[in-house]
Amino acid sequence: MAPPRKHETDVILDAARALVLAGGPRAASVAAIATSSGAPAGTLYHRFGNRDGILAAAWLRALERFQARAMAAEADTPAETAVAMAVAGINFARKLPQDARLLLTIRPADLLDGEPDASFQKTLAAMNAPLIKRIRAFARQLYGSSDARCVDAVARAVSDLPYAVVRRHAHDEPMPSWLEADVAASARAVLERFGERP
């Protein structure tokens, strides 16, 4: 059995995230991450390969945390499950505000030294696939079709709406207590109104 790691990955990724949020992507050098996390630079290079590897891991961890909450959303009907998925975005931002800020304010292309490589793109596509599949399933269940327009309507309610709300309130400490209820009502209205179209 391997010995436990002396420097926990989450501590390293938290340090990288904090540096990026405080000073932008350039503030998160390997040396700065090493100093902030207490992990030797050699450990960082061994575990992540380079600075881009650390920052990509921090960003993907935030995305994974968001998606875990979104995919866990459940309710009695497809429409209410879609609404719960929208509200999950607000809950994520409330529980993990630094991760939400990282996802909202920093694009991978801005975070990394170059464009995200093929491996990053492949990982991102694989991570997004279940969410996209679920949105398509909602479109079929709610509107009887998974054509582009129906999928877009569901995406507006469960993804675009909470994204815009969280973006507006991401730096509020604390976020307003009424956000979940308002996002639920708004998402429900978008889904219902699209279902009533001629």
Indicate where each model-derived feature is located.
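Amphipathic C-terminal alpha-helical segment
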Residues: 95, 137, 141, 155-177, ...
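N-terminal intrinsically disordered/low-complexity leader segments
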Residues: 1-7, 18, 195-198
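Helix-turn-helix
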Residues: 11, 15, 19-53, 57
